[in-house]
Amino acid sequence: MTYLACQWFTTIFVVRLSSGYDDAGLLSLAMSVVGIFGTFANYKMGTYQISDIRRENTVGEYMGFRCFTLAGAFVACMIYAALTCAPEALITVALFYAFKGVGLVIDILHGVDQINRRMDYIGKSFILQGVSTLVAFVVVYWATRNLDAAIIAMLVAAAVVLFAFDLPHCQRFERVRISLSRKKALFFLKTSLPAVIASVAASAIFAIPKQYLALTVGSAALGIYSSVAAPALVIQMGAQYLYGPLLDIFPKLFFEGNVRGFAALLGKTVAGIVGVTVACAIVLEFIGAWALALLFGESIVPYVYLLQPIIVSTAATAFLWFFGDLLITLRHFWANFAGNVVAFLAVIPLTFFCVDRWDMNGVSFAGAGACLAGVAILLFFLVKVVKKGPDHIIGAEGEAARDGAVDAKEAC
């Protein structure tokens, strides 16, 4: 949470320290463009890695594949930027991509930490990354008023954390040697492709109603909606921090045949996400107007009524992410694909109906309805998978996961 807060404060300081909004707009553009291709650079390998309970792949192979996807996504990102952005924005986009790339490399090392149940290493790393990159950005931008120089400072700060903290801690468990065969690269590309497409579909669920809102009501309405939505993002992030550390435990329980333990952990996780949502809804009901006024000024207060529907839609998104990731850990990539694609298809008609009827609130209603449709599909597949048990997992990965769980159980 510290890391995300520091990243968010970067967007605040670029406005506070500059004399206009040009650099803020350029930073927002770089974030948006890089975000499009970040999904392909990530290639959903984090969830796959931490649920690799038999250790079929080495950290070097995961790292090699991450470098491969980072390089490929960078080429695509820069081609897209060259076609859609002003020439002076290209360097900023490239630098911000490099900065985010360091974080994606660190994520692979965090996977090793999580597999070995050292979540404290991950927490310390995120704190170091967040604080160091924010301080680097503020100091350099304040001194130079040069956005590119400030992003370079963030890149250097993140790299220092990578080499001085994360790499040494990871190598306490496993030596990191980058390696990737053609066969392994093709295996990763093929296996995780449905999850990547599903992730792209999920990322578009709210983009569609937002774009329609801007088209029909105006960009000012979208700006208001996005500003009010900022505090509610804590629900999505809180949910990820809640279930993320459990994504290696779920497959162990499942492939060991411990259905009762699996169901109990699932129930606790769902209850936890609901609890975070309810707590945030109550807190923001009382301090939402004050928090929004503090962040964006008094002009935003009349739109505080948008907050509760946003909370509902954010919670629905969190459940879509959770059940999708859970099915990936159980090696049901196509089930995850189906749920997210259904959500994407559902949001299209819902967008026209909801935004036309409720304006800004329509974005929340359309997104929530689409996510809940996707969640229903994901739950259908999850119940089906759990009822059939691990013996019905199809494919080499399913067999490997079953064998790994048995080996781990016998070793204990």
Language-model segments: which ranges?
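Interhelical loop/hinge segments that connect adjacent transmembrane helices in multipass membrane
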Residues: 120-125, 147-154, 163-206, 249, ...
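Helix-loop junctions and terminal segments of transmembrane helices
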Residues: 38-57, 115, 228, 232-257, ...
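Membrane-water interface segments that mark the loop-to-transmembrane alpha-helix transition
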Residues: 1-3, 30, 36-83, 91, ...
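Hydrophobic alpha-helical transmembrane segments
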Residues: 90-99, 123-172, 191, 229, ...
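Transmembrane helical elements of multi-pass membrane transporters/channels
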Residues: 1-11, 128-129, 133, 150-165, ...
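Interfacial segments at transmembrane-helix termini and the short loops linking adjacent helices
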Residues: 18-24, 82-96, 219, 286-315
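Helix-loop interface residues and adjacent transmembrane-helix termini in multi-pass membrane transporters
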Residues: 18-21, 86, 116, 143-144, ...
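Membrane-interface junctions at transmembrane-helix termini in multi-pass inner-membrane proteins
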Residues: 47-57, 102-126, 312-341
